[in-house]
Each structure stands twice: as structure tokens, then as C-alpha cells.
Amino acid sequence: FFLLKPGVPVSDALPALTLSADLLAEAERELVTIRDWMRFCVSCFRGCDVHIGHGTSDPFAEASALVLQTLNLEWSADEEILSARLLPSERAAIAETLRKRVNDRTPLAYLLNLAYFNGLPFYVDERVLVPRSPIAELIQDRFLPWLKDEPQRILDLCTGSGCIAIACAKEFPDAVVD
């Protein structure tokens, strides 16, 4: 809780919720394993009050996705890989992605150009909203109990990435999807 004084900008009253260049440089020097970076990312997300919810559900999942995807590894990579030592260039890439995520508050999906919807991967960037919607569950449940019969036509209008249309086409292969 912050008590603001009249005439004092909010930005001056709140604690710094960004990562300093010195801290990131120290991390690049000292953190050498995937596990180190995942732990550091979680601490940064929590310490800087980073909103989680554009494709991951908690700071650990967000950190795992950030580190592993930046390294071009699967999010479901074997746990043994967590002790792998990173090259300086890999550490720099993670630090830069983390800086953008924390300091610029860029959603991770935009930084990775990847979001999942209904279990399907989609390329995303700043031109579309990050796909996340309870509609994915409705599609998986085949819109039951609202639709009793297979739909013959499905229209996805102005939803951005087209993820709803693609997920519907996969779930209802006999329907015409526009």
C-alpha cells in the first residue's frame, strides 16, 4: 500500500520495479547453468511484480519458457539438462530476453514469437493479441452442451491470429471454416 502525496508523480512514489544493467551484467558473469537462470528469472518476476498470464500460469512456468525457448530447447526438456553450462552468448541472450520481459513488460509470447492455443503453437507478435481464451476449452469440449450436432460452417471474425478458426478446423474437420 502506498500513500501518495498531492503533486508527486506515481512513478516517483513507487519502488523501482526494473532490473539494473549492473544486476544483469552480474547475472551474465555468475549464472552458468539453465537451473541458475530459471531461478534468477523467477526471483526477478516476483521482485519486479511482473504480470504472469499471457500463456503461462506462474513465475516458474514463465521462467522455464523464457530460458528454454531462448535456448531453442523444448519447454518439456528433460530435467537433466538443467545442470548444463551455458556459453557466454547464451547467457547474454537470456539476459536480454529477461530485460525486455521485466523492464519493458513485453509479454513473453511476443519475445518468443510463440503462443499456444488449444494445444497448438502459433506465431505471434505485437500485431495480434496473445491467444488465450476460455473459448479453447469450449472448442475442446466441442461446444457441448450448446451444440448438439456437428457444425457445418464456422466463422472466425476479427480474432487476430486466426487461432480460433484453426483450432475449430482441427476439431471439426468436416466443417467449412472461414
Show where each model-derived region lies.
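N-terminal auxiliary segments of SAM/dcSAM-dependent transferases
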Residues: 5-117
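Aromatic (phenylalanine/tyrosine) cluster motif
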Residues: 1-2
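SAM-dependent Rossmann-like transferase core, predominantly class I methyltransferases
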Residues: 82, 92-178
